[in-house]
Amino acid sequence: PRPAALSGTVDGAGRLAAQGGVTVNSADEAVAAVRSAHDNGFRAIKFYTSMHPDWLRAGVAEAHRLGMHVHGHVPATLRASDAIDIGYDEITHINFIAMQAMPDSVVNVSNGFARFEGPGRYARTLNLDAPPISTLVARMASEGIVSDPTLVAFEGILNAEAGQMSPAYAAFSGTLPPQT
C-alpha cells in the first residue's frame, strides 16, 4: 500500500457529522464531494460514521474510478467486513476493527459515544485468534487491506481498569499538576 498524505473527508450531514469535513445528504452529493476532493489535489478520501450505506457505496465507487485511496471509519449498521465489501482500502482506528465482533446493539448505533464505549466494553474479551476477528484479519491480509489503528487514541478505553490510570500515563503521573 502507498500511504496517502492528502485526504479529503466526507460524512453524512447531521448533528454528529465529523467536524472539518464535507457533509452530504445523498449519494449524488457524496459523489460530488469525492470529485471535488480529487479536483483539489487529494489522493485519498476518508469517510466517517454518519454516512448512509448507499451514499457510501456511491462515494467509494467514484473514488476508485478516480484512482483514489479509500479509508475511514465504519458507518453505523456496518462492520469492517461490510466496509471492505463496499471498497475500503483501509480501516481507520482499532475500534472499527473490533466492531467486527460487537453485538448489533453497538454496530447499529449511529456515530457517537456508543461507537467507542461498545468496543471498550466488549473488546477486552475478544479472542483475536478466533472468528470473527481472525477471519477479518486473514481477509485483510489476503486482499491487501490495511489498518491505521491509532492505538494511542483507544488505549485508555481498551486497556484501563475501572478507577485506575491508563498504563500509558502512569509513568508520568507525578510529573504534571493534578489538574492535568
Indicate residue ranges for each PLM-predicted region.
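Active-site mouth loops of central-metabolism enzymes
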Residues: 14-29
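Glycine-enriched alpha-helix->loop->beta-strand junction motifs that scaffold or abut catalytic
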Residues: 65-67, 85-91, 144
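Structural recognition of alpha->loop->beta junctions
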Residues: 79-102
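Generic hydrophobic/aromatic pocket-lining and core-packing "Φ" positions
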Residues: 34, 60, 80-81, 137
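Surface-exposed amphipathic alpha-helices with a cationic face
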Residues: 56-67, 141
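Active-site neighborhoods of metal-dependent hydrolases
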Residues: 5, 33-51, 97-180
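Divalent metal-coordination and catalytic microenvironments
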Residues: 3, 41, 63, 72, ...
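Aromatic/hydrophobic pocket-lining residues that form the small-molecule binding cavity
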Residues: 30, 56, 133
